[in-house]
Design a protein with these regions (language model features):
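Ferredoxin-type iron-sulfur electron-transfer modules in oxidoreductases and energy-metabolism complexes
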Residues: 20-38, 59-92, 109-136, 264-265
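Local cysteine-cluster metal-coordination motifs and their immediate loop/turn environment
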Residues: 41-63, 85-108
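Feature captures the FAD/FMN-dependent oxidoreductase FAD-binding
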Residues: 75, 138, 143-147, 195-246, ...
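Glycine-rich dinucleotide-binding loop and its adjacent helix/turn
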Residues: 122-138, 196-216, 241-303, 411-421, ...
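N-terminal Rossmann-like FAD-binding beta1-loop-alpha1 element of flavoenzymes
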Residues: 142-168, 293-301
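Rossmann-like dinucleotide-binding cores of NAD(P)H-dependent redox enzymes
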Residues: 169, 173-203, 207-208, 297-344
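FAD-site-proximal beta/loop scaffold in flavoenzymes
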Residues: 250-281, 366-440
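A conserved FAD-binding loop/helix module that cradles the flavin
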Residues: 436-464
Length: 464
């Protein structure tokens, strides 16, 4: 097979920025089969597979890409499916540039192979062309409960179901999917794709119980006692938003990004018929620089805002959001106000947001995170007229589970403490992973934690 030595990736077709910033349809349109084969031939099949070491779920990347290069897309899917329960999701939202693609040998001198784009293509091809029912393993007679139907919980459920466990997933919201459903907008991750991944788990025998708030409706003790689950995996995420504690945060027109995106993505609060309408003004300031901030800003634009600012206390080079998301936001007209930080949100006479006062920042010495610490420049305050402020400053785990589970150790941030990478907690038979352990992180890292915990749960139950 001839290699493709083009130094750059095959470009991803996308909607025109001036069209897509007014709709919620997917921005990236996906590769054609010809594009996928051409991109796959850029892989030089290194012996030590550095790309695979960068994948939290351990997909054999050179093997699946080799099948794509040969045009055998179903074989490629089967390779991915051995390790990942959510390939169509990962191909869209994983930060490949800091994981698999970040370790790609081609990336040393040129652009890395478009691993994420190829994973997405393979998953989409399989969904559109293969309609056989999944093989349901024979039951091994054991029961496991999963708390939370986000990426960690779904991955653990899928891996355990493949081993013959009877798995029930308890989800607090009225739909399964967790952050994949409520946090990531349709234009980045269509909800129909998430639902199809969940439907695949249902066909494997996984049960989903929605509107079940564990810690309120049932406790972990009840699941392991009265309901006779032999192990419990806690993948309840981190949905408690953080705020700055500045004057004006309680004004009407101030939202957490979590609330703004949940009401937009899940509750369709922007529709005129909504029972819980969301007020999106004409001038919006989004405070923060991560992927969630980009999602909130780009959603606000699509909901009718005329001007949307990203307000971030460090510089453009320090933005934690994916490079692709920043580029898409810039293309769509989002204005980046970097090296500045809010100090007050100002009200109008009716208690609504009227403006936001910020102070300019400069970068000092590196802090504990390794990034240069932002320092205020005295006397540099300025005010911007805005009528909506969205705070995207991170999230922490909800305290409900830890407060109703005696003996479950948590740290000062409210995250569940686990041993090593296996997710074992201080309670016997209780495992945890994803944002409930790490705080807000990436989808693929949560999936990796769910996968590791599923393996540990299997070993625990089989050793009893």
């Amino acid at each position: 097979m001839a290699f493709n030595m083009d130094p750059k990736k095959c470009p991803m077709p996308t909607q025109d920025p001036n069209v897509r910033n007014k709709n919620f349809e997917e921005v990236a349109l996906g590769y054609t089969a010809e594009m996928a084969v051409n991109e796959a031939k850029r892989c030089i099949h290194c012996k030590n597979k550095p790309c695979q070491t960068g994948c939290p779920v351990g997909i054999d990347i050179p093997e699946f890409i080799g099948h794509v290069a040969e045009g055998d897309f179903e074989a490629a899917y089967q390779v991915i499916n051995r390790s990942s329960s959510l390939p169509a999701v990962c191909g869209r939202v994983c930060p490949q540039e800091s994981q698999c693609e970040g370790k790609c040998t081609r990336g040393i001198k040129n652009e890395p192979v478009g691993i994420g784009r190829l994973e997405r293509f393979v998953a989409d091809w399989h969904r559109e062309n293969v309609h056989t029912a999944p093989i349901v393993p024979a039951s091994n007679g054991h029961k496991v409960a999963i708390i939370g139907a986000g990426p960690a919980g779904l991955t653990a459920a899928g891996d355990l179901a493949k081993l013959g466990y009877k798995v029930t997933v308890y989800e607090a919201l009225h739909v399964a999917g967790g952050v994949l459903m409520y946090g990531i907008p349709e234009f980045r991750l269509p909800k129909a794709i998430v639902q199809q991944e969940i439907d695949g788990l249902k066909k494997m025998g996984v049960d989903f119980e929605c509107n079940m708030v564990i810690g309120k409706v049932l406790t972990i003790d009840e699941l392991m006692g009265e309901y006779r689950y032999e192990a419990v995996f806690v993948g309840s995420g981190a949905g408690l938003p953080r705020f700055m504690g500045i004057p004006g945060e309680s004004l009407k027109g101030v939202y957490s990004a979590n609330e703004f995106l949940t009401r937009s993505n899940l509750m369709k609060a922007y529709l005129p018929t909504s029972k819980t309408p969301i007020r999106t003004g004409k001038k919006v300031a989004v405070v923060g620089g991560g992927n969630v901030a980009m999602d909130a800003a780009r959603s606000a634009l699509r909901l009718g805002a005329e001007t949307v600012y990203i307000v971030y206390r460090r510089g453009m080079a320090e933005l934690p959001a994916r490079k692709e998301e920043v580029e898409h936001a810039e293309e769509e007209g989002i204005i980046f106000k970097t090296l500045c930080n809010p100090v007050e949100i100002l009200p109008d006479e009716n208690g609504f947001v009227k403006a936001i006062t910020c102070i300019e920042m400069e970068l000092g010495e590196p802090d504990a995170s390794g990034r240069r610490r932002p320092i205020e420049k005295k006397g540099s305050e300025f005010t911007m007229d805005v009528d909506t402020v969205i705070m995207s400053l991170g999230t922490s785990p909800n305290p409900l589970i830890r407060s109703t589970t005696p003996g479950l150790e948590t740290n000062k941030h409210g995250c569940i403490v686990t041993e090593g990478d296996e997710g074992k907690t201080s309670r016997e038979g209780v495992y945890a992973g994803g944002d409930a352990v790490t705080g807000a992180a990436t989808v693929i890292k949560a999936m990796g934690a769910g996968k590791a915990a599923a393996k540990a749960i299997d070993e625990y139950i089989q050793s009893k």
